[in-house]
């Protein structure tokens, strides 16, 4: 807010950037992402998303979808409000997609991903698509 880069800020940024990388190479790939990461791989089959949006940006949207699938409205509100506040995606338009896009290619690739091998409950393309559509109408 003050426009000053402090040592504490640098430490925080390094922790945020490095910790997920350490975790991702320390656990079996089956336990490393769930819906948010599977959807990242699906969404990036659209070349404009892969070209114009960062990994964390797309995964942050996938996290919202994951929370909607989980029907965890309390955590969804927290994550949604955070995304809004810092300018991360909260809807398809933020990823340059239309609400009426059937996302068939996105959902197919999402479902083929190993990230969905071990989930706490069975996940299918219909669940993810319905969560995406519900997220389109969600306003926190």
Per-range role (PLM):
Residues 72-140:
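C-terminal charged capping/lid subdomain of soluble metabolic enzymes
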Residues 1-82:
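Active-site segments that bind and position negatively charged phosphate/pyrophosphate groups
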